[in-house]
């Protein structure tokens, strides 16, 4: 047993922290409670053996969401001395890349990582709408409009055989790129449909073979490999 009167050296403290980080569950912080909830459901379908080892933190009482709020949350975790491995996982859009720029270039503990949802082939040639055009233009929307709903399955993005278009909104000067997003109503429809998709897959595993889990699997792979490299 450790003698409480014995001083702990910095080296010993670092060693213990490293052991806790390796053995304890991986904490995944997202931009909001909806992302955490949907990714937790996704994990139960694609990687059920990892449930309990990967924890998506639900901060539903958090007053604000988004990438800027996520950056503050990571800083709070670091200041509190959370020893678990902590992964900040953000959207793959212009706003998130801009908001997390400082965090990614700063000095974080070795047990912390910052990642975005990965680029997806589906999003490399995707219909978009400009502010003054009703005719879709196909563009690469990776890193510009890659919110979670874009990763939950092609069949959920389609309506009447057409992909829900990305609407370009604000221009982010620092990245010289526009921010894009699908309509909020469509986002809510996709979230509801995904929950039904998960229920169907859990009740009938064969059903999952006819569903598109490509984007979800790519995100989970990003999580699992986040600590392979600095």
Protein language model features and the residues they cover:
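Acidic, divalent-metal-binding catalytic cores of TOPRIM
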Residues: 1-230
């Amino acid at each position: 047993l450790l003698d409480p009167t014995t001083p702990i050296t910095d080296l010993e403290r670092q060693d213990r922290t490293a052991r806790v980080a390796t053995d304890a569950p991986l904490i995944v912080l997202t931009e909001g409670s909806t992302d955490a909830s949907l990714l937790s459901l996704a994990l139960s379908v694609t990687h059920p053996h990892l449930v309990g080892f990967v924890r998506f933190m639900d901060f539903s009482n958090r007053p604000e969401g988004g990438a800027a709020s996520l950056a503050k949350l990571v800083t709070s975790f670091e200041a509190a001395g959370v020893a678990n491995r902590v992964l900040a996982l953000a959207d793959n859009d212009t706003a998130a890349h801009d908001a997390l720029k400082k965090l990614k270039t700063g000095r974080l503990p070795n047990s912390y990582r910052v990642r975005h949802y990965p680029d997806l082939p589906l999003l490399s040639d995707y219909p978009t709408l400009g502010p003054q055009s009703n005719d879709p233009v196909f563009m690469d929307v990776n890193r510009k409009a890659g919110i979670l709903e874009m990763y939950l399955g092609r069949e959920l993005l389609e309506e009447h055989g057409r992909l829900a278009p990305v609407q370009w909104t604000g221009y982010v000067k620092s990245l010289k790129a526009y921010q894009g997003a699908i309509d909020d109503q469509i986002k809510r429809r996709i979230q509801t449909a995904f929950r039904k998709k998960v229920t169907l897959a859990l009740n009938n595993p064969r059903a999952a073979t006819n569903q598109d889990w490509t984007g979800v699997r790519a995100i989970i792979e990003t999580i699992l490999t986040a600590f392979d490299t600095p």
